[in-house]
């Protein structure tokens, strides 16, 4: 009896081994019967991987920057700032008395909060303040406002040694200029300009960052009197239809000069004003429909830019383009994007002078695109490259575009597993 059981057990072992050998020869049934078998991963390089790319300029919208950049970098870059104080306090209440009209001011100042992270400061820094209010000029025109930065309109300023420059600075203003605005109920609009004995760039806090500038003045010559504090506010453009524009124009950056040479066959990210690159992909149907993507690496070749140095680093995020196929204005489409890190967790940290291949992992996004193919109107397979922060640092990165040569243009390396079709062995 024992001998018969041993023979029967041996037959089962042989049958099982035969089944596995048969599975290897029968193809698709093997993974189900023999899960311990290794899975073959295939690689492919898609070149070109983009059907289209383009660079769009002017991000974010004026006044929505997280800081105002004051920069003076020789004949290449110069930026200035504008802060609007369209409502000034015209009355004060002395101790134990009733309200009085202000007829004299003293110790007028504008307080600026500086963000010195990644700032470039020469040995001496000078801040000049100009009256840039003109009721006859188009106050939404950058050129019209820049024309008001003239010597006869300078109403304040001061200089600091680099070692004495703190995170908060008080720049003196002309008392007579401030009083004239108060008495005549006029707007106080300040234009800021920074200069030094070398290349300079520093960020100034804004309403958006929660560290807005502030004007202060005493309502009389009594040094013991408490200064009156006035926050920024914009009253134009007037009307109930423009509240967001008024808010944006409360404080903003003006680009007086950006003379960085443009290159053919490239796309740009960052810079002043901010640039974004829109990349639309063309992926083979068999990759999207018939495989499981385990890795997808977008390779971009960076073109070195002469402007900038090792201090001008820039972080670049790849955002998923969310605008549907009916949005044909691609500049608008670059505003309809995902939050950073959604489906594309990777980012780049580069300097303008860098060169070589930069890689962005995108396998999660490719899997999402595969799931969207069942939609009636799936969104385009596209991403937007965007600097972070945007339009507050003078760093710009450039990459070769799809119109460049085959060895320089964007490519994608994909590792995938062919999907098995299970059936009867």
Q: What are the language-model segments listed below?
A:
Residues 2-6, 17-425:
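Secreted, disulfide-rich extracellular signaling modules
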